[in-house]
């Protein structure tokens, strides 16, 4: 499509050259009509009669005058072109870099006037929870990368202040279980439903059964993949070798059978373990059939195209010796389930993961910071959580959950690997879900997620550094902060019979904060980097200044939360509660 010609712009741009043509044309006329033959005489006479020449407003149409006028306009055009071509680009005070620290006016458009509707980042900076601000250019996702070495205050200066905001549902990784004790009562008093998954003390945990959240065959595949990724031993090559693929087939077949065929109370890991224990392969007898083989034979007779049957057929292609090795590997992988307490913990479900975005809920995931034996349980839970919430947002709520779900993932490197987390973190924003990834150093993320680590970091619009000394983290942060231009002067002294002194001023570039300066940063300070905004060097948030601080057990020990008392209290029937009554008819004794 041809672009429309802007006549007004064309006239304005060429008007100076028209004036130049007119002026030079008139001067040529004056010079031509001046008396005399010598150049000096004509020049003198021309200046004397210049007023009379311009008395006639029309240009001279004499060919010589017109030619000289055109030449004058062309020379002006050429001069303007050459000046523009050779123009110097000066950025006063920014010759070597324009980095600077952010100011209050820089963060103001990103914060909500209502303090309680902000994500707390520092003492002076925050981020509005409104995902659709009036001006879309100020919209930022709520994914946050928090980096802080041991003792830098990740829990005190970030996790607790944000729990006190109470504007969302929360899923909190809680090493040692202290956050639940300190913040649980505050949340309960403000109408939150409290859930707890405790992998340190199973008796203090609510029950979690991954089988309760299987909705389709693809969920079976996701569950199997999460188990494989988070329980692989040192002997596995890459997680995709022959043996692991064979294990996946076997797990998929068994879980598929349990999900389709078992009664509700048997849909759990205990049944899966019993099926594996009932399996047997004999190297010297390929025709031998164990109880599980017979069970699948019976299912195949009824439903030859059953999902579980198809997977089991592929597994049974393995020879006796190979099948025996697969069974040994499966048994070793699920060895933690030999612990009766773990089997009981995962026998049925109380978590209601798919309801966390429906109402204000706080789920505390308590893990050990010294032992990762049961971290695969946490990884399975998080994997199912993200997928369930995304599916519910899409299928029930037209793409956005009614209550925002914030995942405060403390000790993120210790909760196992969430499959395809790099893809999840890029898509959860639109569903009103966000993740705060809390690490001791950025290298921890690369250790777990390898090449996907950069994608995960790139999908966090906000980075908060609370302190640390890990070299790669310091280097990357210093580079991101950029360079500023500073003034530099040198002095020189020459000693001789005639002493002389010199003073030389110049400009140079310097990192806004070098690696060594970041390493020795004041313990009360932090660095905040928000996408599209200058970085901030600010005070860490003072938790005692929060309006809800007095509701924490930090302020008053009587505010300590007891999960066992809370669970027993939930079992007491209140007089005000209502129930649905179903008439089941008469029940005959056997």
Mark where each language-model region is.
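Low-complexity, polar-biased intrinsically disordered regions enriched in Pro/Ser/Thr/Gly
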Residues: 127-133, 232-242, 488-506
């Amino acid at each position: 499509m041809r672009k429309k010609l802007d006549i007004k712009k064309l006239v304005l741009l060429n008007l100076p050259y028209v004036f130049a043509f007119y002026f030079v044309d008139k001067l040529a006329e004056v010079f031509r009509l001046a008396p005399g033959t010598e150049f000096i005489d004509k020049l003198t006479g021309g200046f004397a009669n210049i007023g009379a020449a311009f008395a006639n407003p029309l240009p001279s149409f004499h060919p010589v005058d017109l030619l000289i006028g055109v030449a004058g306009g062309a020379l002006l055009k050429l001069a303007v072109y050459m000046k523009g071509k050779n123009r110097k680009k000066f950025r006063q005070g920014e010759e070597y870099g324009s980095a600077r620290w952010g100011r209050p006016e820089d963060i103001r458009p990103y914060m909500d006037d209502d303090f309680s509707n902000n994500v707390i980042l520092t003492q002076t900076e925050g981020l509005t929870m409104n995902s659709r601000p009036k001006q879309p250019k100020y919209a930022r996702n709520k994914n946050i990368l928090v980096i802080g070495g041991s003792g830098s205050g990740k829990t005190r200066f970030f996790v607790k202040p944000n729990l006190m905001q109470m504007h969302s549902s929360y899923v909190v990784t809680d090493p040692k279980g202290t956050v639940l004790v300190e913040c649980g009562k505050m949340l309960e008093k403000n109408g939150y439903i409290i859930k707890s998954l405790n992998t340190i003390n199973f008796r203090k945990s609510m029950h979690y059964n991954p089988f309760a959240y299987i909705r389709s065959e693809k969920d079976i595949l996701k569950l199997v993949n999460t188990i494989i990724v988070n329980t692989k031993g040192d002997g596995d090559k890459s997680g995709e070798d022959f043996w692991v693929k064979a294990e996946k087939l076997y797990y998929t077949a068994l879980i598929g059978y349990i999900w389709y065929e078992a009664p509700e109370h048997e849909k759990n890991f205990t049944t899966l373990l019993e099926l594996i224990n009932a399996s047997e392969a004999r190297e010297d007898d390929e025709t031998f059939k164990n109880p599980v083989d017979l069970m699948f034979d019976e299912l195949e007779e009824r439903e030859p195209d059953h999902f579980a049957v198809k997977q089991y057929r592929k597994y049974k292609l393995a020879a006796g010796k190979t099948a025996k090795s697969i069974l040994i590997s499966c048994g070793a992988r699920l060895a933690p389930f030999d612990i009766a307490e773990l089997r009981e913990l995962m026998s049925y479900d109380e978590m209601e993961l798919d309801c966390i975005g429906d109402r204000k809920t706080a789920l505390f995931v308590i893990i050990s910071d010294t032992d990762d034996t049961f971290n695969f349980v946490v990884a399975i839970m998080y994997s199912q959580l993200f997928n369930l919430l995304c599916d519910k947002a899409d299928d029930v709520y037209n793409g956005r959950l009614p209550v925002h779900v914030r995942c405060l993932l403390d000790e993120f490197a210790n909760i196992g690997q969430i499959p395809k987390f790099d893809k999840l973190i890029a898509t959860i924003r639109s569903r009103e879900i966000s993740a705060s990834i809390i690490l001791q150093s950025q290298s921890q993320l690369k250790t777990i997620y390898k090449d996907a680590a950069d994608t995960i970091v790139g999908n966090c619009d906000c980075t908060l550094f609370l302190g640390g000394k890990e070299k790669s983290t310091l280097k990357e942060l210093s580079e991101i902060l950029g360079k500023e231009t500073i003034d530099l002067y040198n002095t020189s002294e020459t000693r001789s019979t005639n002493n002389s002194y010199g003073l030389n001023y110049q400009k140079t570039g310097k990192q806004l904060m070098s690696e060594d300066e970041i390493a020795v940063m004041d313990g009360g300070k932090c660095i905040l980097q928000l996408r599209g905004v200058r970085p901030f060097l600010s005070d860490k948030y003072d938790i005692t200044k929060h309006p809800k601080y007095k509701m924490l057990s930090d302020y008053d020990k009587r505010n300590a939360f007891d999960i066992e008392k809370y669970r027993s209290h939930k079992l007491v029937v209140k007089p005000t509660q209502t129930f649905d009554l179903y008439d089941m008819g008469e029940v005959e004794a056997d």
